[in-house]
Amino acid sequence: DIIYTPEVRYNVPASNEVNLLMSQNDETLRAVVISDTHIGSEKERLDLLEDTYNYCISKGIHVIFNCGDIIDNISNPGKVDSEDRVNYLLNNYPFDKSILNFIVLGNHDISPLKVYGQNLMTILNNYHHDLVTIGYCEGLINVKNEAIVLSHPYIDCSLNANKQSKIVFYGHSHFYKIKNFLSQVRYLGVSVPPLCNIFTRDISYPGILDIELSFDKGCFDYLNLKQLIPMYGSFVPVNENIYYFRRIHTDKMKEEQIVTPKVRTMSPG
């Protein structure tokens, strides 16, 4: 039996949306955000993916938001033949009965469909029920009276424009960056670091995001956003920011930066 705890349930409407149902009395959503695992690539880091699950278990986190490129383009040379890459993903992606993944599929993930007619969205929904796909390129997660957008690659999301989501997580960039579009459309955009060894900048490195999202009467209250990097078989925080949403409709969102250490190396010490 598969039991997701605490009350983490979902249903799937017709469009690129899912509803993440929280208890009426639960005012905090804790989740980990990852992106760009590129499974099947020579630069995959399955060890870090396993460490991510262990981190979630140790912290009592039951939700992972995945911003896409879960596999590497099957046209690229890799650890396994292109026709076996989807099976390789199914056999090697971790599983824990208390963890549910919400995934938007990226530009690499569409390659099996183009080459072999393998729709990764259908395959994952049928054979890996803990990996809930919410569409290609962009998807929306409704939670209480709000919504979170997952996007891959970076685009000004039409879903965000329609739903007026205040939070968008982007894959594809392979580095961590916070993008404030508050003066125009008033939402927080976060580029999620990769969970592999494929980098686009010399200052980037693998990592995950730990988020704690607080609600007040069903609406976003504040977001505690932590950037973590791998070290000693786990993850350590290197950056933490808090964003307040209470007056987002009448005032610019307030940011409180707690600590921003400069991390130049992955070496201990």
Name the predicted role of every residue range.
Residues 1-9, 247-269:
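Non-catalytic terminal accessory segments
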Residues 1-35, 268:
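Acidic, histidine-bearing metal-coordination/catalytic regions of metal-dependent phosphoesterases
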Residues 17-21, 39-133:
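Core catalytic region of metal-dependent phosphoesterases/phosphodiesterases
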Residues 20-32, 140-149, 182-187:
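Beta-strand-turn-beta hairpins that frame and shape the catalytic cleft
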Residues 31-33, 63-66, 103, 149, ...:
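Residue-level marker for buried hydrophobic side chains located in beta-strands
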Residues 36, 68-69, 106, 152, ...:
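Active-site glycine-centered loops adjacent to acidic/histidine catalytic or metal-binding residues
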Residues 131-142:
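Short acidic low-complexity segments
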Residues 147-149, 154-246, 265:
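Conserved beta-sheet core of the metallophosphoesterase superfamily
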